[in-house]
Each structure stands twice: as C-alpha cells, then as structure tokens.
Amino acid sequence: MRSKRFVLGVPFLLIIAVLLPARAQSGWTVEKTFHIGGDGGWDYVTADPEHHRLFVTRTTHTLVLDSESGRVLGDIPGQKTAHGVAIDPKLGRGFITDGGGTGAIIIFDLNSYATLGRIPTVPDSDGIIFDPKLDRVLAVSGDGGVLMAFKPDIDLTNGKIDQIKLDGAPEFLASDGTGKVYVNLEDKDVVAVVDLTSQKVVARWPVAPGGHPVGMSMDPKSHRLFIGCRNPQKLVVMNTESGKVESSVPIGAGVDATGFHDGQAFASCRDGSLIVAEEKGGQYDVAQTVKTPDGARTMTIDPAARKIYLPTAEFEPVTSGRPKAKPGTFMIVVVNQQ
C-alpha cells in the first residue's frame, strides 16, 4: 500500500495543545447523593469495585450498599463500636473492627453477610486493611497501641492474632505488599515502620510540617505515602524508602482519610472539602477543592468507576463544639471525574 503523508497546520496543532492539557486536568464533581437514613454514626467506608458494593460502619451495625444505586443490600448487626471493614473477595470473607468493650474483629460472609465468628482483640480496634500480596488482614488499636496481623482464613474458634507493640496511638495504616507496614501514630506525629517478619518497629519518621497524622494511603509504584494531618492541616507526601517528606499540601480542617488514584492524591475533610492534589515538577500541589457537605471526613475510591464515596449526614446548628447529626439523615455523597 502506498503511504500517504499528512501535514498538520499550525491552527490544528494549537487546538491539540489546548485540548490535551484540559483532558489531563479533568475535574471532579459531586454527581449525586444516596439518602440512606437509619440509626447510628459512621466511620470508615470500603469499596468492593468488582461487585459494586460499599461497606460502611454505622456504630452498632455495618451496612452493605449497592455502589451504583445506593440500595441497601445487607445489614450486619452485633457491633458495639464498629470502625472499619476489610474484605478478601477471593476467600469470600469480610472483617469489621469493633472497638467497643474489650475489642473484637467480626468475620462475616461476603455473599450472605452472615456473621461467621468474633475474634477477641483489644479495646479501640480501629483502622483495618487487607493486603492480598501478603495474604494478611492488618488492623490497629489506638488505646491498645498495637498493630494486629492474621491470615484471612483464621480459625473462627481458636484463631490467634499477632500483636506488635507500637509505642504510640495508631490511627490508620498502609502495607507495601513486601512485609513493611506503615502506621500513623497520632500522638507522636510520626509514621512507625513495622517489619512483619521480625514483628518489630524498625523506623519512626516525623510527618512535620504536618501535625497529628490520621488518614493514610499509598502508591506502591512511586514508593509514596499520602498522610492526612491535623494541626497543622497538611497532606504530607512521604517517601516509603527513606522517610523523607517530599511535599506538603494545605488541606481543610478535620481530615480523616486520604486516597490515591491515577496520579492524584485526595484528602477528605470534616469542613466539607475534598482536596485533590497533583504532582508538578516533583512537588504535589492543590489541583482542585471539591465542595462536599460538612462532615464528609472519610472516603473510599472505586478506581474502575472513577468515583469517590463519602459518608456524612445533616447536622443540627450549634454555637460551639462539634455539631450532632440529625436523626435519619445519613447519606453517601458520590463524587465522580468528568
């Protein structure tokens, strides 16, 4: 076949130069809100992209929602103070941290949502994740000051959970898939690096210029942690190999979770701001601030759908102190990328 040559004129090249950056910087916007209602507070929310589900803790129970419609698919009862959910889709098990009383991890079936067992832990069991490469469920206890680790197929009757002392009050965590776990110590303003093989803390890295570290997420490819800090309010970008703080981004008040997807970092804040940060010239900076309802302090990302889900509610007006949620107004705010 004879080849043909095409010459692009200057006006056409200018159009490309204008359109390509606009596409690369496409923004995020609130798409819709699922009005769920019901009783209970809330904490973390976890996405199951493969099955289009959301798991959201409601203090004494955990809701399972359809992530496309907001329809309630199930309700897992029997918790005292539910905090977070981790799932192992391959095994078909889910895990809920219950920080009430003496503490426990509730294990449930991902298909029927039936409770399979309750493994004793320590009080204030809180953040929880599943690392599929390590085949480990990892959780932390703020009051207990420990990192907990166990296999997802743990014996429901006699199973034991490894506990690693952290010398601090952990809030959330991330795992690199090779045996290193990174834990925010909120009271120490540091990240504790835990080696799961030796079951010891091998490093402590300050998060300054950020304040108390609470939210955490990770990009294993770039070896970076994204740490949401309070007082000062910063999204801190930390190198996981050296502990060096590479960037710090100003964020809103009351951050409680962060996320990372497709080159962008996110911080959800209680003051009704979802911060979107991007890397430019080796430094992260604010690319967009999405206005969300007040109280939307935690989040989860569905990378396939390119959506972010944030639980919150309507609040009673107050003159001072933290406002109380209006009964029956619980909702999930859905933010998507244009």
Q: Which residues fall in each region the model found?
A:
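Intrinsically disordered, low-complexity segments enriched in polar/charged small residues
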Residues: 7-10, 24
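Bacterial N-terminal signal peptides
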Residues: 9-18
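N-terminal secretory signal peptides that target proteins for export/translocation
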Residues: 1-5
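Predominantly soluble domains enriched in secretory-pathway, periplasmic, or organellar proteins
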Residues: 21-338
